[in-house]
């Protein structure tokens, strides 16, 4: 959610620019730029408030920063009407206006560690701070609830900070908002004004958009817009049909209760039955604040709601009063903003690429833009139906999203910015790599596929790159350029590999003559050499003297290591459709050898936990193809492992045991811990349930730890994990953490 907003007056969807004091020391071009920025920011904020923004939060923040810089350089430009001095949003005439009991302020932002440190030093220089409260900054809609003698009497949007809109009827439809406070532990105060954030959980947002698409209605761009649109419905029944939720994060006006610390207020709010986040932490140093920020930067998608940063507050309320506020924000709090995950940019073109299983996928060619900390030029569009559903046209300004390590995707168009020159995308009818006619694998498929699985060089390149990946045989030296060199070299005319079966039979003599294009792994398009402006060509395996580069020795060493990988990794490396790591692990644990899997019937495959009819049919179909079986035999002849370790040794120590691993372990990487369990016959899953036997916790465990405590699942620290691996489940249960022990203490 933005921490800034437009003014309270609006005429014809556009606010008049502020009338700054015209002094001789302000150049005319600066005054003009200030007026333009002020007008634009007010307009952008109004559209944001309505749930239909036309620029991203990141772009808004950049413009606001520019305006602040101008006003810092020329203080005479600062007026009460400047966007830098205002809070919230304008009041529409669709809801009754209501005055807040206490002004709902915004927050100042920190976009870097240096800005966070500067804030902390300013605060500590004025008051003796001994504790900070850290909480997640929910990307939702700010509201205020008013309770009188424990009964909800009013709810309002933030509005301009002084006057909001009465949304009481709509708020009453949200299940998590109590209509009466719970007084079983503490009596309800005479008056209580509660501040919080209304949001739409991510899964609920996806379901809502799917339903809207089925009804032929335009989808929402993101959960924040969906929450705003849902909460501002004239008909409360529409709001009730949307699974909105709320978390409260502060108290405004109050009578009949004494608040000494921010953290104490949260304890009271929770006791009264109000929804409070379970991810709040009170810390004593700035370094601990940094640790909290860093943890949720990495685990940004653990919560059920979207976040865009961390709010840091001075915990002591008496110190908050001493620090006071500016006209728009408290001095005792700051919002540390994470790099934006959504930005707007130009959709230059839509092209297609072929994947390892033959699926031909449209992708967006974008005007380069920075999102989530990295520059993005391409984004996935999944399939032709998805392009149509999103309503994007070539030439559109589009919203692009990149969440963590997830591949960037185009969310949708900014329709208001269309010029009439945009054009629709037409899905090609031929493979972009080999020219084979595209078709559906079965009736009703949304994907078009290239059927030329054996001879399409594009598919082979993608399969080879996949084999080298961490989820398969983990051959670091066999990257995307090497995969291209081995399957589609410019020289020699005949590639060293005709299929992946030959991978373990490569020789140095085959590699040295190779010259190849350098392709982009996201698009398979040639990369351009900035010096020549032409496609980049390299001699990948040989130096200028024609001698092997170090990469050659490394490649052959890693190929030998790959032969010893666990059976499940070999199964994944075969690129059988629908068989990912989880299914492969289940199959390897059950059948113990690749031959047994190849010979199993559909019924026998479906009998394995986690294997359904789609996966079973896909496996049977794959092994029925002659050249697929030839790949297996070539690998077997080269010495690739085809059985589970100890396949003939009978039952193993952790047979039937399901484990979840969370947090950072000292002796094991996440994959290493997982494989240690699997070698002993155990299963590692990604979620905690009543069927989970153990949860292993390291440093900074996430919500899985909390769920394990709630469900009573045995929790092991790293020492207990060693007991599990060496002595088995019975001994591990005896080594579990007791209820009064905590990995978080």
Curated annotation (Swiss-Prot):
Keyword Endoplasmic reticulum on entry: no
Substrates-to-products reaction catalysed: NAD(+) + (deoxyribonucleotide)n-3'-hydroxyl + 5'-phospho-(deoxyribonucleotide)m = (deoxyribonucleotide)n+m + AMP + beta-nicotinamide D-nucleotide
EC number of the protein: 6.5.1.2
Transmembrane region(s): none
Active-site residues from the entry: 137
Keyword DNA repair part of the UniProt annotation: yes
Official protein name in the record: DNA ligase
Pfam families, sorted: BRCT (PF00533), DNA_ligase_aden (PF01653), DNA_ligase_OB (PF03120), DNA_ligase_ZBD (PF03119), HHH_2 (PF12826)
NCBIfam families named in the record: dnlj, PRK07956.1
Region of interest (Disordered), ranges: 1-27, 216-235
Family: Belongs to the NAD-dependent DNA ligase family. LigA subfamily.
Binding site for Zn(2+): 431, 434, 450, 456
The organism's place on the tree of life at top rank: Bacteria
Annotated NAD(+) binding sites: 57-61, 106-107, 135, 158, 197, 313, 337
GO cellular component, one term: cytosol
Domain (BRCT): residue spans on this chain: 649-738
Function of the protein: DNA ligase that catalyzes the formation of phosphodiester linkages between 5'-phosphoryl and 3'-hydroxyl groups in double-stranded DNA using NAD as a coenzyme and as the energy source for the reaction. It is essential for DNA replication and repair of damaged DNA.
Gene Ontology MF annotations: DNA binding; DNA ligase (NAD+) activity; metal ion binding
GO biological process, one term: DNA replication
Cofactor(s) this protein requires: Mg(2+); Mn(2+)
Enzyme type, top EC level: ligase
Keywords, alphabetical: DNA damage, DNA repair, DNA replication, Ligase, Magnesium, Manganese, Metal-binding, NAD, Zinc
């Amino acid at each position: 959610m933005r921490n800034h907003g437009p003014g309270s007056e609006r005429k014809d969807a556009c606010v008049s620019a502020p009338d700054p004091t015209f002094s001789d020391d302000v150049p005319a071009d600066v005054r003009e730029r200030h007026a333009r920025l002020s007008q634009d920011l007010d307009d952008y904020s109004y559209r944001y408030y309505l749930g239909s923004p036309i620029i991203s939060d990141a772009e808004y923040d950049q413009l606001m920063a520019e305006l602040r810089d101008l006003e810092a350089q020329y203080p005479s430009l600062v007026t009460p009407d400047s966007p830098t001095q205002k809070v919230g949003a304008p009041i529409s005439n669709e809801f009754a206006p209501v005055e807040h009991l206490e002004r709902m302020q915004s927050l100042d932002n920190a976009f870097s560690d240096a800005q966070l440190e500067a804030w902390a030093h300013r605060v500590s220089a004025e008051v003796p701070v001994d504790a900070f409260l850290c909480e997640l900054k929910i990307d939702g809609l700010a509201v205020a609830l008013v309770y009188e003698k424990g009964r909800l009497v009013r709810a309002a949007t933030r509005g301009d900070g002084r006057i909001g809109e009465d949304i009481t009827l709509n708020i009453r439809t949200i299940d998590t908002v109590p209509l009466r406070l719970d007084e079983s532990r503490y009596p309800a105060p005479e008056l209580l004004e509660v501040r919080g954030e209304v949001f739409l959980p991510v899964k609920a947002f996806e379901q809502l958009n799917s339903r809207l698409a089925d009804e032929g209605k335009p989808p929402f761009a993101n959960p924040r817009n969906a929450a705003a649109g849902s909460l501002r419905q004239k008909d409360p029944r529409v709001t009730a049909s949307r699974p909105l939720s709320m978390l409260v994060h502060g108290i405004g006006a109050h009578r009949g209760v004494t608040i000494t610390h921010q953290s104490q207020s949260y304890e009271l709010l929770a006791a009264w039955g109000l929804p409070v986040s379970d991810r709040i932490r009170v810390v004593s140093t700035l370094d601990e604040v940094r640790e909290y920020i860093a943890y949720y930067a990495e685990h940004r998608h653990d919560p059920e709601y979207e976040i865009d940063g961390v709010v840091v507050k001075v915990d002591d309320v008496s110190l908050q009063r001493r620090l006071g506020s500016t006209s728009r924000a408290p001095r005792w709090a700051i919002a540390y903003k994470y790099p934006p995950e959504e930005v707007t940019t130009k959709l230059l073109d839509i092209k297609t690429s072929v994947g390892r299983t033959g699926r031909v996928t449209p992708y967006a060619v974008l005007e380069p833009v920075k999102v989530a900390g990295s520059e993005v030029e391409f984004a996935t569009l999944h399939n032709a139906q998805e392009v149509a559903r999103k309503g994007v046209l070539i030439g559109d300004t589009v919203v692009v999203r990149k969440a963590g390590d997830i591949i960037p995707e185009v969310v949708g168009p900014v329709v208001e910015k269309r010029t009439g020159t945009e054009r629709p995308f037409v899905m090609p009818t031929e493979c972009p790599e080999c020219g084979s006619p595209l078709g559906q694998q079965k009736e009703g498929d949304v994907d078009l596929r290239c059927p030329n699985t054996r001879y399409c060089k594009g598919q082979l390149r993608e399969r080879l790159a996949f084999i080298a990946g961490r989820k398969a045989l983990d051959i670091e030296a066999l990257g995307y350029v090497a995969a291209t060199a081995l399957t589609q070299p410019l020289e020699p005319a005949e590639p060293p590999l005709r299929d992946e079966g030959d991978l373990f039979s490569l020789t140095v003599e085959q590699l040295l003559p190779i010259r190849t294009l350098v392709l982009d792994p996201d698009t398979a398009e040639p990369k351009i050499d900035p010096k020549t402006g032409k496609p980049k060509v390299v001699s990948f395996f040989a130096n200028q003297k024609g001698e092997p580069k170090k990469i050659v020795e490394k490649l052959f060493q890693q190929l030998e290591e790959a032969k010893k990988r666990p059976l499940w990794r070999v199964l994944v490396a075969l690129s059988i459709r629908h068989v990912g790591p989880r299914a492969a692990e289940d199959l390897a644990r059950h059948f113990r050898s690749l031959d047994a899997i190849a010979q199993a019937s559909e019924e026998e495959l479906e009998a394995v936990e986690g294997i359904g009819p789609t996966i079973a049919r896909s496996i049977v179909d794959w092994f029925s193809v002659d050249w697929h079986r030839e790949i297996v035999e070539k690998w077997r002849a080269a010495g690739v492992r085809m059985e589970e370790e100890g396949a003939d040794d009978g039952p193993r120590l952790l047979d039937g045991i399901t484990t979840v691993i969370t947090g950072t372990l000292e002796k094991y990487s996440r994959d290493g811990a997982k494989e240690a369990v699997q070698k002993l016959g155990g299963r590692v899953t990604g979620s905690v349930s009543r069927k989970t036997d153990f949860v292993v916790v390291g440093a900074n465990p996430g919500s899985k730890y909390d769920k394990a405590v709630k469900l009573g699942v045995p929790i092991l620290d790293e020492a207990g994990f060693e007991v599990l691996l060496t002595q088995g489940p019975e001994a591990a249960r005896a080594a579990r953490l007791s209820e009064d022990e905590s990995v978080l203490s």
